[in-house]
């Protein structure tokens, strides 16, 4: 059995490729079922975020397993394999384990140390368990990876400060507005006419960061206006005007800064649409949806600047140097967690031998006990029989304790295999060739 991961991320693919492989929450279950049907895949779990799509699997054979996952990704995205494959990466065994733990810790994120990825890994673990696509190996790996993410955030300063896609989007707005006014740095958003489209978790984070950067009023649009009203209610000190998505064009015309973050699978704002809108201000669009909410052709509008998640790199690079120093400390913690998992995984190799040894000794115990009891005659009470039964079980457990502990203890693969062969030979656990 082998652990592999196949996927793509902001490091390997632009947003126009990533959005074709974004698997929404409501489609995860079906995708897990499709992958699980493959006999080469023993366990599988999917991580889908705005910046990455990664499939972790326990497979019978590495190359066949990776090929099967790539075939699934090709079918799902409807992109030719020759066009998709250059954007895909794969890691195997120890590298796959380390990669997931680094992802969980925020060490592989666009915004180094961002906190949202940890909850996304937790969700990946929950969905795998709910759909019964994961088993003891991946469940343990995912649990250990969550522990790694928590440890990095509690024992280092990597997670401090504004580190999320939403916060980077707000900082990008500050930076671009500042540049318009000849300011090299971040400016207040107090005077901006802000429109937020979408009322999900990312929009909640957007509003939180907008508030911290000086915004005291904004318009919130959502297809379900009740959801927008509920979200606005969580910010009583902000003036939030909630509208239906049907009023999008009107509210775009009244805005100077528009953030979009919806679960739409296709862009709903394109150049043809905005050309019909009478703009009262120069306008900035910042789209953090994946798939994108705003078509790329909007960038051709003379009075609109349009940005997507790939443009956040400009903001991220401003504070990466400080975080890179902390990241080295975090990577050391992650590697420690990897060792813990790998030692546990390696110890499973001993389980069949241990079980066979227990089974053989239990058979001997029962046979010898039965012989002894038959010689004791009818005068031997049931209570006395239970005492002798417990005694013989205790002796077997005492005999097994040291060798079983040794076999399960941390050691190299060669050392463990040598120990297993000795035990198998001494106790005749395998047939002689």
Swiss-Prot record:
PROSITE patterns assigned to the protein according to its UniProt record, in alphabetical order: GLUTR
Annotated site, Important for activity, chain positions: 99
Pathway assigned in UniProt: Porphyrin-containing compound metabolism; protoporphyrin-IX biosynthesis; 5-aminolevulinate from L-glutamyl-tRNA(Glu): step 1/2; Porphyrin-containing compound metabolism; chlorophyll biosynthesis
Xref: InterPro entries: 4pyrrol_synth_GluRdtase, 4pyrrol_synth_GluRdtase_dimer, 4pyrrol_synth_GluRdtase_N, GluRdtase_CS, GluRdtase_dimer_dom_sf, GluRdtase_N_sf, NAD(P)-bd_dom_sf, Shikm_DH/Glu-tRNA_Rdtase
Top-rank taxon, per record: Bacteria
Residues at the catalytic site: 50 (nucleophile)
Stretch forming the signal peptide: none
Family statement: Belongs to the glutamyl-tRNA reductase family.
Protein name (Swiss-Prot/TrEMBL): Glutamyl-tRNA reductase
Name of encoding gene: hemA
């Amino acid at each position: 059995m082998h652990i592999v991961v196949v996927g793509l991320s902001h490091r390997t693919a632009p947003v126009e490729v990533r959005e074709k492989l974004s698997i929404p929450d409501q489609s995860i279950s079906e995708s897990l079922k499709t992958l699980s049907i493959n006999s080469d895949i023993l366990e599988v779990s999917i991580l889908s975020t705005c910046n990455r799509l990664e499939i972790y699997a326990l497979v019978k054979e590495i190359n066949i397993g990776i090929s099967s996952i790539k075939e699934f990704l090709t079918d799902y995205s409807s992109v030719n394999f020759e066009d998709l494959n250059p954007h895909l990466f794969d890691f195997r065994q120890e590298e796959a384990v380390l990669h997931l733990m680094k992802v969980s810790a925020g060490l592989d994120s666009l915004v180094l140390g961002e906190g949202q990825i940890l909850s996304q890994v937790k969700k990946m673990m929950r969905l795998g368990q709910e759909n019964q696509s994961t088993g003891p190996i991946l469940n343990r790996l995912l649990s250990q990876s969550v522990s790694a993410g928590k440890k990095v955030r509690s024992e280092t300063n990597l997670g401090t400060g504004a580190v999320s896609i939403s916060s980077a989007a707000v900082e990008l707005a500050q930076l671009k507005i500042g540049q318009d006014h000849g300011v090299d740095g971040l400016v207040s958003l107090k005077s901006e006419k802000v429109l937020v489209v979408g009322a999900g978790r990312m929009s909640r984070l957007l509003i939180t960061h907008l508030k911290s950067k000086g915004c005291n009023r904004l318009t919130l649009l959502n297809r379900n206006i009740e959801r927008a009203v509920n979200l606005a209610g969580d910010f009583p000190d902000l003036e939030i005007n909630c509208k239906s998505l049907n009023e999008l064009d009107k509210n775009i015309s009244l805005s100077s800064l528009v953030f979009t973050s919806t679960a739409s699978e296709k862009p709903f704002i394109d150049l043809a649409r905005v050309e019909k809108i009478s703009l009262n201000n120069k306008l900035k669009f910042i789209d953090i949806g994946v798939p994108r909410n705003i078509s790329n052709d909007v960038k051709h509008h003379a009075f609109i600047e349009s940005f997507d998640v790939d443009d956040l790199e400009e903001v991220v690079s401003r504070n990466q140097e400080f975080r890179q120093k902390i990241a080295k400390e975090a990577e050391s913690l992650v590697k420690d967690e990897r060792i813990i998992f790998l030692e546990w995984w390696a110890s499973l190799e001993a389980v069949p031998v241990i079980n066979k040894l227990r089974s053989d000794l239990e058979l001997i115990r029962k046979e010898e006990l039965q012989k002894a009891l038959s010689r004791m005659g009818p005068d031997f009470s049931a209570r006395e029989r239970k005492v002798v039964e417990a005694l013989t079980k205790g002796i077997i457990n005492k005999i097994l304790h040291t060798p079983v502990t040794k076999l399960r203890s941390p050691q190299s693969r060669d050392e463990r295999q040598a120990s297993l062969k000795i035990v198998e030979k001494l106790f005749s656990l395998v047939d002689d060739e």
